[in-house]
């Protein structure tokens, strides 16, 4: 699918990997709907991008804001062709420690944000995508979700995060098969450790400890490297039903 002229909501689109994706798709000619709960950052980015950019205040744990955001993209730009799910968060907490078992409400919140939020966004986007006119390959839409290498090699303390991201990986092929008749593709990217505002807060010794486990290149990923893969998935119609690791071959140990 050609990015130019297509409409792409990006959840978590005002910071980190989502911001890089918003910028790259916009530069490639897409209409970008920055869907984020941070209004200040979202509107500031929208202003920077200028024409073909809009902002929707979306909390992916609240389905009414998800539906409103997708509806706004359709109202503003006429259709939805691409969805990139970047909204999500992590949490550090072991299954049990000396103080007691993992807090169940926290576990549920991470699942609600990373898994249910992802599914809620894609179901509303797909509902609109199925009405698009197909291109020469019969494509009507492309959905790209974000998982994590923690879905495959979670470290200690990542039980909630790993469960949520592994579930995103697990539903990728199921969603793909559900949407195939509608001409909608679905892929997932599982990134390793990337330079984002969150990792910028890490102390340098912690960063060095992570980098020592990365075979090559021995650095954190750049947000635009994630965004470039997003663009390639959109443009390559044979990418479908796959989870792609973007991690410089890292395989993290338990801790």
Give the ranges of each region predicted by the language model.
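Canonical Rossmann dinucleotide-binding motif of NAD(H)/NADP(H)-dependent dehydrogenases/reductases
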Residues: 2-33
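Conserved mid-core segment of classical short-chain dehydrogenase/reductases
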Residues: 67, 75, 90-108, 127, ...
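Active-site helix of classical SDR
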Residues: 122, 164, 172
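Alpha-helical segment proximal to the catalytic Tyr-Lys
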Residues: 127, 176-178
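Residue(s) in the substrate-gating loop at a strand-loop-helix junction
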Residues: 148
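Short C-terminal tail/terminal secondary-structure segment
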Residues: 153, 231, 235-255
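A conserved structural motif in NAD(P)-dependent oxidoreductases
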Residues: 215-226
